């Protein structure tokens, strides 16, 4: 029997490799479908691109949630539980697979599967970056081609049988969840529970990034979501500062400023991270930028500069002690054999002056303690 006719989908051919059990499941909106998959090229070697079994955990999607690779929902809803089938899908269905694959690989590496940390997600990501970070996926992106998916359907859960994660919510539910998550993150931050606070901010960011992929980049609604996202990312960075994860703060804040160079708080938070890793010049430059953009933050800037001066002085003292210890250890070593040649005449140049302490003229940005209050929930749904 021609399975392509049964699916009634152009550009799809199905071959059942192992029959399933029972009747066809009742796939309804909100059903969770759990499955293993293997993606291959249509070349002679049947080159494997991705394999969920190698990752060590199955994949799952929610029916009706506009999954990135829409054809997978069609394929899965044609299957019985425990069925194994091979699907050949033409290029019209596989063009966005490289973007999905990148998300899956990020997840396998323990990173956020929605890639919020690079401040763009899905198709919107392609407007800001020209590579997916994987050579084979870049090739697929440039030259889309038919792909083969081998899928094993493991389980189908009704909407009432499992607890839905925030990223599985509808568009309207996500928008309602964001201010709640934001406010909870702020509450936890004030209690000093920075790990839990950062998780709440991350959840809110994931919701907004998912919504943002459904908007045209740089148009009004996309920019509104971007502003909300940047606020949450900076709150998340304040948690990272408390957890002493300074280089990740530098990564996130620098990425924000590449796209939105007028965000004062991003300069302030980045300055604090630079100061913690003794990047004196960079910290002072960011604090100076804070003053240029927001002169009213002069008091906070001065405070940060004093802290920077103290930190640099402590570092210089540590270096002097280290050098002194090295010299004292060298003095206890047996004297070296005298050189056979007369030593060269010593230089009469005076020793270099020690660096002066940095001046105290800068420091700003909202203090890290009170995290930004959550924005009011927008009054309209972003469902598409």
UniProtKB/Swiss-Prot annotation:
GO terms for molecular function: farnesylated protein binding; peptidyl-prolyl cis-trans isomerase activity; unfolded protein binding. GO terms for cellular component: cytoplasm; cytosol; nuclear speck; nucleoplasm; nucleus; photoreceptor inner segment. It is found in: Cytoplasm; Nucleus. Highly expressed in retina. Specifically localized to the developing photoreceptor layer and within the photoreceptors of the adult retina. Keywords: Cytoplasm, Disease variant, Leber congenital amaurosis, Nucleus, Repeat, Sensory transduction, TPR repeat, Vision. Changing residue 206 to N: No significant effect on interaction with NUB1. The keyword Magnesium does not apply. Changing residue 302 to L: Found in a patient with LCA4; there is no interaction with NUB1. Residues 53-145 form the PPIase FKBP-type domain. Residues 328-384 are annotated as: Disordered. TPR repeats lie at residues 178-211, 230-263, 264-297. Changing residue 79 to T: No interaction with NUB1. It is linked to Leber congenital amaurosis 4: A severe dystrophy of the retina, typically becoming evident in the first years of life. Visual function is usually poor and often accompanied by nystagmus, sluggish or near-absent pupillary responses, photophobia, high hyperopia and keratoconus. Its main location: cytoplasm. Residues 367-378 have a biased composition (Pro residues). One of its GO terms (biological process) is regulation of opsin-mediated signaling pathway. It comes from the Eukaryota. May be important in protein trafficking and/or protein folding and stabilization. Changing residue 239 to R: In LCA4; no significant effect on interaction with NUB1. This is Aryl-hydrocarbon-interacting protein-like 1. Changing residue 262 to S: No interaction with NUB1.
């Amino acid at each position: 029997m021609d399975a392509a006719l049964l699916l009634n989908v152009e550009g799809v051919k199905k071959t059942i490799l192992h029959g399933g059990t029972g009747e066809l499941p009742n796939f309804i909106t909100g059903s969770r479908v759990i499955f293993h998959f293997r993606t291959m090229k249509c070349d002679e070697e049947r080159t494997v691109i991705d394999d969920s079994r190698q990752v060590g955990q199955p994949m799952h999607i929610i029916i009706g949630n506009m999954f990135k690779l829409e054809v997978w929902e069609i394929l899965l809803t044609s299957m019985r539980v425990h069925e194994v089938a091979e699907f050949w899908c033409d290029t019209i269905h596989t063009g966005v697979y490289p973007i999905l694959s990148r998300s899956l690989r990020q997840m396998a590496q323990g990173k956020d599967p929605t890639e919020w940390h690079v401040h763009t997600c899905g198709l919107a990501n392609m407007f800001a970056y020209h590579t997916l970070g994987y050579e084979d996926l870049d090739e697929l992106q440039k030259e889309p081609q038919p792909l083969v998916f081998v899928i094993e359907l493991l389980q189908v859960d009704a909407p009432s049988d499992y607890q839905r994660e925030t990223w599985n919510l509808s568009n309207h539910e996500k928008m309602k969840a964001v201010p709640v998550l934001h406010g909870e993150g702020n509450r936890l931050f004030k209690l000093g529970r920075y790990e839990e606070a950062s998780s709440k901010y991350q959840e809110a960011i994931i919701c907004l990034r998912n919504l943002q992929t459904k908007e045209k980049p740089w148009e009004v609604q996309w920019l509104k979501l971007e502003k909300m996202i940047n606020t949450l990312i900076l709150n998340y960075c304040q948690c990272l500062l408390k957890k002493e994860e300074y280089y990740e703060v530098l990564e996130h804040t620098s990425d924000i400023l590449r796209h939105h160079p007028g965000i004062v708080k991003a300069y302030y938070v980045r300055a604090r991270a630079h100061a913690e890793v003794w990047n004196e010049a960079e910290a002072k430059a960011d604090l100076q930028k804070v003053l240029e953009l927001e002169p009213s933050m002069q008091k906070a800037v001065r405070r940060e500069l004093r802290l920077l001066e103290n930190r640099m002085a402590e570092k210089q003292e540590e270096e002097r002690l280290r050098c002194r210890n090295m010299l004292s250890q060298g003095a206890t070593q047996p004297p070296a054999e005298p050189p056979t040649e007369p030593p060269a005449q010593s230089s009469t140049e005076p020793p270099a002056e020690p660096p002066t302490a940095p001046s105290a003229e800068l420091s700003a940005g909202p203090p890290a303690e009170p995290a930004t209050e959550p924005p009011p929930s927008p009054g309209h749904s972003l469902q598409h």
